[in-house]
Each structure stands twice: as structure tokens, then as C-alpha cells.
Amino acid sequence: MRRGLISRSKAELPDAVLDARLARVRAAMDAAGLDALLLYTNNTRAAGVSWLTGFVPYWSEALLVVPRDREPVLVAALSYRVKSWIERTSRLAEVIHGPRIGFEAASMIAARKADAAIGIADLDGLAAGIVEDLRRGGPRLSLSDATALFAPLRAEADPAEIALAMRAAAIAQHALAQTPGRGASLGESIAAIEAQARTDGAEEVYVAAAPDLDRDRRLRRIEGEAALGESFALRATVAYKGTWIRLTRTFPRDGAVQPQEAAAARLAAAVAKLPSSDGFAGFSSWLVEGCRIAQPLAPLMGSRVATAHPLAPSALVSVQADFEIEGRPLLLGAPALVGRRGEAASLLVPPF
């Protein structure tokens, strides 16, 4: 469940931006012969619907119906009492409420065209019960998987999304800078990071830690207290207006000087070669995450990713890498923008 501020800013996400995104989607729908596109959303898979409407659910689930010739309609399992909140925080032609979102969406579409051609982004990931309700609500509707249609459109970041990612990254930088330093417990550091991120307007923030990099470099959620090693890593995952980024830093327990400049330069050099993985040769491990359809930070490629997904030009991603400098373990990460063809990729902000 979302615990931070969910609001809409027309200065940061103007109607013209949503209009341009919808126009691109509708052009692809027209070429594919689709009458409508369906996108599923919940509090963990919000990045498809929020990209087209600004809507981010704090809980529950919904289906966005994007007709080829009309404005989008949201069919939400949330109760009617939050209707005005949904309308304030998003741009939608209509909000329909009902517990069976598949049935309601299909009935609405079938009422206008009984044999409409419907594309569903990430059909394989849609719950079987919702698919069954779609078929019950519109027995003559033609349902097909529209993942290949939607994914390339969603992957390419426009200037508005890049600006939101920069804002999220600035929140993460400021939050990580609040780590108390020598003598502070891990719990105190995490609390300070969360408090600052929420004060700065984060929609959501999650903090993960690797308490002792000499023993284990895996990041995890900390329950209770954990003893700190000579160096430890903290990762802030921040959401702002539907855009998610990760920022990871390594900290010395005793406040000793770290090779920050050399470490940041090595990460930036590896990122510059994306979408090729060549820059990460020699790293202990690495990971690139980003949005394909609805999950905001899905694993796209990395040393432990079995099936890699090609990075689209102008894609926003978050990169994390594990390596050593002068014998010291370092875990670093930052958001990045993949270049267009022939251009180098670049970090949006440095990790330190």
C-alpha cells in the first residue's frame, strides 16, 4: 500500500504530454486494427496506466480501457468513495467502480461494438479470473496479446518522464545524504533516509541495505537491527509522480575516505556502453532495471538475469553494480538514460 503523497501536477505532467503519449498508442492501435487497448494496474504494477493518465493506485486494482476513438476510461475495484480523489490525481474521461473489473470493462466495450478487437498489454500476466470475466462480459470480443505493441512505446522516455526521474533522483540523493555517519546504527540511518524522502515529496520510498559488504553484498530489507561491517551499502528506491528510480551508495562505518570519484567514473564508463553489456566486464555482478509494461523496475539485463530484454533507445533505467577498487568492495547504483542509436548512455545523477 502506498504511504506517501499521491498528487497530480499539471506543471510537471501537462495534458499535452498525455495527449502525445495517447496519440502514439492510438496510431499503433490503428495500424494493428485494434478497437481498444486494456492495461492492468495495481500498487506494484502501476507504470503503464500512470504513463497514460497519471493515475497511481494506493491499493487495489483497475483496468484502463483506451478506445481508439475516445478518451480513456478507468474501471476500478476501489470503492465509489474515492472517485473524487481518482479524478483529482489523474486525467480520465470516466471512472467506473465495480469488484469485477474484467466484466465491467468488457460489458462497456461490447455495448458499443459487440465484436470489438481488444488488445491486452501483458495478457500472460493478467489474472485468469479477470480474463474469464472479460470473456463473460463480452462473449464476442476478440482478445489478443498487445505486449509487442505497447512495450516499445512505453520503454522510450519523453522529456516529461526524464524530468520526473531527475526529481526522484534528487530526492534520493538528498535522502541518502542524511545518513548520520560514524556511530549511528543501521536503523537510524534508514529512518533518516525515509523521513527525508517523504519530506521532499516522495510518493514512495523503500530502503534496502547490505550491512557488511565483506560478508554479503546482497541488498535486503532490514527487519530489526543488523551489525555494520567496515563498509555497508544503502539503496533508496524512490517513486515520484509515477516515476521510479534507484540510487545505491557504499558507506564506511568509521567515516574513512572512499575512492568516490574513481568508483563513480567506473560506473559511468560501464553505463556509457549500454545497451551493450561490454562495459560491465570485470564487475562482480551488475543489474539493469526499467519499465517494459507496468512493473516500474523490472530486471532487463544483468549478470544474473537469465533472459535479457533489449534496452530501447531513450529508455530510463536504474543500474546497480558490484566491484572493487583498491581492494575495497563497492556497491553503487544510479538512474541512467540510454542513448539513441549512435549515442552513449549516461547517468542522470552521480551515485555520490
Residue ranges of each PLM-predicted region?
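Active-site neighborhoods and metal-handling regions in enzymes and metal-associated proteins
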Residues: 1-352
